[in-house]
Amino acid sequence: MAKTRFIQSSFVSGELSPLLKGRIDINQYYQAVETAENVVIVPQGGMRRRPGTEFITECVKGISKKSPTYTMPNGGTSSVLNDGDDTTSTSTTTPIGTTDPYVVAKMDLLVDLPMKFIDLRQISLSTGTSSQFKVQYSTDDVTYADAASVPLLGTNPQNFRLLVDHTARYWRLARIGATDLGAATVTIAGLSLYEESAILSTPRLVDMSVEDDRHYLVEFTRDNIAIFRSQLVGINIQTTRVADIKPLYSGLTSAEIENIRVAQVENVMLIVGDFAPMRLVNLGTDSDWFLDLIPFTNVPQYDFDDALSPIPVDEIQVMTLGHTGSGQWKRGDRFEIDVEGVLSKSISFAGDSTPDEQASTVFNIQKNLQEMPVFGETGVAVTRTGTKQYTITISGESTKDFELFSAYVTEGSTDHEIDFTKTQSGSPRKEDVWSSTRGYPNSICFYEGRLVIGGTESKTQSIFMSKTGSFFDFDIDDGDDDEAIFATISSRKLNDIVDVYPGRNLQIFTSGAEFAVTSKPTTPSSITIQPQTSHGANKVEVQDVDGSTIFVDRHGKSLLSFLYSFNEDAYTSDDRSVLASHLINQPVDMALLAGTASDDANWLFIVNTDGTATILNTLRSQDINGFTSWKTDGDVKSVCVVDDQLFMTVERTVNSVKKLFIERWDFTYLMDCSIKSVQVAGVIDGLDHLDGESVKVLTRDGQADANEGYVLSSYTVASGEITLDPSEVYSFTTYEVGLPFVPTIKPMPLNTNIGSGQNQMRLKKIVRMNLRVYESSGIHIDGIAVPVREFGEAGTTSPLTGGSIIPKTGIIEDVYDINGWGREVIPTITCPDPTPMHIQMIEYEVEGN
């Protein structure tokens, strides 16, 4: 029997589609695998265990406002506290002084109920400041405990949403403390309690960076906006909930939440979606935020001319041609009309004596007015209503409430006068392009000092750009270079805008094609929107990856790279996922982790509609482009990168109940949804999120090497904690507790040359196999544990002894007789326990038939 050797030292092409099993003619076949599950590609060529995830928090479900009985023992009108109207407020009448407790308002729910939030609306002090106000709860109206502290109050009204998360019947807002506040009283417009409902909606995660060391994760849910700060504390990343905000929308569905888009400049985030556009501002500290509607001015107008359009009212102005001296109007005299700063062409007076002269003068006035850019294509009518008197009626698409017209003579006697009077003010049929009637913007970004809005619900193919340097002003009247722009894509097919991206040009992704604004600079008179490619994109927000813009095609089946080509002098779109198309399944979200402090890879995390995830490892300069799959005990729903930390939301079934968690990708975690904690008297708590679930336990970061990296027994969480077996209790040791996952690598079917040709489809046998590994332990081949021969001084450890499970770098040597004879005898490499795994190279000795 002929024997050959085959070495695979690169895995940078990742997992290949089953459709490529026969493509032994391409280089990618020999640097790829058939299965790459729960692993990631290392840019240097190997594959390693994917990161685990740290549990951050459970996502907020829907919330509903309660209607307790209110009392205000220190004066005030309690009926306004839950009316939902921030414009009506009430004030206490008793001075605060040194009263402790000073109860502003008390709420009685009649029975004990679990409350999630309390809203304080437009609360202020009449004088002074205080940080001693608390929200408290009680089950008996006698003994109260703190549920939340109110941030510093002053004389300016403020809004707060506080997380209370307690079950009680009685709740109160009170000053707790003895600081003398003198004659100060409290004014408040709203005090509302909210209970969490069972409505589960996928949140939208976005990042917001205010300074180099201040990075926030913003979570949008159906009734809440939660803000978390991610920061390095010591050697660990710490993610802390710092604020909750009542949004200016309510009751969003999962689909509506998914459509949220944001753009950020300095400490301001602009938010658009299926609601009135909002502005979120950080005021300097983690807990100090302000949310309001974006203060747009001069919103672009459009005449939709349908059943929803306003009924227009005609504008009527009367023009009279007169004179002050002896100079009479003569045929051939000329004049121009000024309409709100815009001049008409020169109008010729044709006389006013005969019917023909009168008709000709009327025609000249009407024609030149209609051609003015301030009017539409139709709607200007002129009639002669007296001697040298002409009534101008503006109707239909042209009407609005105009300023009084004016005019001046360009040719004729200096005695001529032209007077105007307004007899009726008009109102237009045109209306704001975005509004509660017409819907709101779909996408948003900044480009060349302008705010760009890509499509609205009613103008899906239009681009709107603000005035230069004035992001909220969309004044387009004069068409000056710095004024706003309103442009519409015109092509042979429907091109609804789904995203806009500010690259080397403004890139516009639509449902039918990809476009770019190629004019430099972009002005109202020069804007050019040119088609580039015609794939079409779905609604997933595009990502800038390694110098190209990655988007998902409109069918949700491929990942495309939008990249400028100097040879074409245009953008081209290449299919990045053609070799792993089976891993792209209607993506709903994606985010780029562009290298970290410990890794130089670019990982694009793609969330599929079926709850699986796909990771693209890419480094264009090194021709690295490989996909691996991510599977967990649950469904991944959304993803976001904050600075160099990747967060995801995962829907898990815990004790038969569906829950949504925010989790953080971290290579120092070896399990999913896990926590790191210490044991106290053999008990590890903080596991409420996994109550009723079976979890694995791993020792981590022990002060003695003997306590590091042991995989302990499985336990079932009860009442948010587990009790360790006495034999598994270690002092000075951190434990990781979470849900296990299994990394799996299965190489492509072997193809070697045995002299008579390629043998991929022939019977063969792997008689020996060696693996080079890095910092690994607990590796199994076809379900059988194999030892690592560690590099080091001779005789320090036996290569055949399990011994310590501290990760080792070395060779798994002389694995014999893999799977017997067959055509596809490739082994499966796994790591069933939560231990490190990093494969660098595989060597086969193959015997062929």
What are these regions (language model features)?
Residues 42, 54-55, 59-110, 124-128, ...:
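Disordered, acidic Ser/Thr/Pro-rich linker "stalks" and the adjacent N-terminal cap
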Residues 174-182, 829-833:
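Short beta-strand-plus-loop segments that form exposed binding edges in beta-rich domains
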Residues 426-433, 717-758, 831-847:
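Surface-exposed interaction regions enriched in Ser/Thr/Asp/Glu
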